[in-house]
Amino acid sequence: LMLPAILAGRPVLDTITLYFDQMGSVGSALNYNSPSIFAFARDVSDEALAAKLGTAAAFTLMFAVFAWFWWRRSSITNWALLGGALILVVGIPFLLPHMHDRYFYAADILSLAFAVAAPAYFFLPLLCEFASLLGYHAYLKMRYLLLMHWGAAALAFVLIVALVFTAAQLHPVRRQKYS
């Protein structure tokens, strides 16, 4: 990730320390036009606590997915990996505080790849793109197309579908073949 910046002429030390320099520059808002779980919470009395809970939830999700795959490692298939990846790229920015619309780009791309590989799930990229559209529209037009919690609800549904799909793949009794 740093190589293009260095090749373009940015000093190596500046490139390495860029994110450390920006650590204190994050605003205090829990949500910056993103379809995250914080789109449901408009008036939070203790934003610092909510941010810590969101961060803990994201780490818990990540740890749970990794532990689940470790526990079911003999049942891992390419389909299970695809489902697990979708859980992570949707779930982590969905749960983390201070997210912007751009943090869901990987979810947009991976949900599209998922739908191409498993056409029965054609609705997943539509829901992800709908959620992203709400965030990008708010940023670019400086007004909301719809309330951001509609996008958050769409991503919550994508997350649930990805969890159910992955569970079906990791538990061979219920595994479905798609190819």
Task: Explain the meaning of each model-derived region.
Residues 1, 112-120:
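Hydrophobic transmembrane alpha-helices
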Residues 2, 6, 10-11, 17-95:
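Aromatic/glycine/proline-enriched transmembrane-helix motif characteristic
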Residues 11, 15, 102-105:
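Membrane-spanning helices that line or support transport/gating and their immediate boundary helices
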Residues 79, 93-101, 116-118:
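Short, contiguous acidic/charged loop-to-helix segments that flank catalytic cores in large enzymes
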Residues 105-109, 127-128:
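Hydrophobic core segments of alpha-helical transmembrane domains in multi-pass membrane proteins
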Residues 109-113, 157:
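Alpha-helical transmembrane segments of multi-pass membrane proteins
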